Amino acid sequence: MDIKLLDKAAYAGRKFTARYQTAGYYDIRPSGQGFQLAYVPFDAPEERSFDDTFYGDWLEDPIAYGAFEGERLIGFVEGSMETWNNRFRISNICVFEDAARGSGVGTRLMAAIQQEAATRRARMIILETQTCNENAISFYKKNGFDIIG
């Protein structure tokens, strides 16, 4: 597997679908000066998906890296600086193929984008996910991220 910079001219506006399975969600409630998390299982596991595009128009000077098996794109990560507050935002990270999940593809993509944020001297890296995307939450925590709200 190779990690390569994705050419913006070739990928901008190209559509993709991200999929994940989930058995529950984290209920977030205000508590004092912070919040509490409580895991709530669904009655049955569910599959969720959403459609998006590479290099969204709303991103400020985005960059993206792809994970390739030969010529096949099996995953990617995308991010951009938010210059107004010197933060680097990871806008998308996705491993498309179920067989590639848990094999280190996401970790290598995350390392590439974290290095990009360091090169740009970002004061912090942020990202968002759905409260029901259990695997993503676990992955982000494993890679040093904390839940902040």
Task: Report residues per predicted region.
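Conserved catalytic-core motifs of GNAT/GCN5-like acyltransferases
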Residues: 126-129, 141-149
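Glycine-rich ATP-lid loops
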Residues: 102
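DNA-binding alpha-helical recognition surfaces that contact promoter or target DNA
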Residues: 112, 119, 138, 142
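Conserved beta-strand-loop-alpha-helix junction that forms the acyl-donor binding cleft
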Residues: 96, 127-137
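Conserved GNAT acetyl-CoA-binding A-motif
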Residues: 88, 117-128
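Extreme N-terminal starter segment of soluble prokaryotic enzymes
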Residues: 1-2
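Acetyl-CoA-dependent GNAT
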Residues: 5-91, 96-99, 110-112, 116
